[in-house]
């Protein structure tokens, strides 16, 4: 279904310039079970438009977050390069911003908590915010306090 009158969500400018159109694609990380009928796999259009006013890009259609993150298949800990990066990144951030145990690190979309784990190992209080409950449970089991929620105004107000 084509949206003929689309405005950019940020600046409200009319969008009519296609940046890239990749056709239809299955939802990321929404693997089908062996019993699933591949012919009914949900596909969504992957078309991005660029705003001629602010030059930011947005997709013309998107799925509800609840449909994407109800059982997320990707875990940060699967990537050895990510794990190595987080150790270096945390060391650099602690030094650059003089972070101590008097501070708190909050990560939005914290996945299984491996970035926060590096801060916690240095006795810096942490909090993860992760919408996918299956991934958030893994973070909690490894000792990373995690709020299972989408980050928005309500979640921010609850944290404060």
List the model feature ranges, each with a label.
Residues 112-124:
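Conserved SAM-binding loop of SAM-dependent methyltransferases across substrates and taxa
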Residues 132-134:
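Conserved SAM/SAH-binding beta-strand->alpha-helix loop
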Residues 139-140:
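Conserved SAM-binding loop
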Residues 2-81:
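N-terminal juxtadomain amphipathic helix
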Residues 125-130:
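Conserved SAM-binding motif I beta-strand of class I
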Residues 101-111:
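Conserved class I S-adenosyl-L-methionine
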């Amino acid at each position: 279904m084509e949206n003929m009158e689309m405005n950019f969500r940020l600046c409200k400018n009319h969008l009519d310039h296609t940046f890239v159109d990749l056709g239809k694609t299955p939802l990321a990380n929404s693997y089908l079970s062996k019993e699933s009928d591949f012919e009914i796999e949900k596909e969504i259009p992957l078309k991005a438009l660029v705003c001629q006013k602010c030059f930011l890009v947005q997709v013309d259609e998107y799925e509800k977050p609840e449909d994407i993150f109800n059982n997320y298949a990707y875990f940060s800990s699967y990537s050895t390069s990510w794990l190595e990066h987080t150790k270096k990144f945390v060391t650099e951030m602690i030094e650059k911003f003089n972070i101590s145990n008097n501070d708190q690190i909050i990560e939005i979309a914290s996945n299984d908590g491996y970035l926060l784990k590096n801060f916690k190992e240095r006795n810096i209080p942490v909090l993860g915010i992760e919408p996918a409950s299956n991934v958030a449970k893994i973070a909690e089991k490894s000792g990373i306090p995690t709020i299972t929620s989408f980050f928005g105004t309500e979640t921010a107000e609850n944290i404060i």
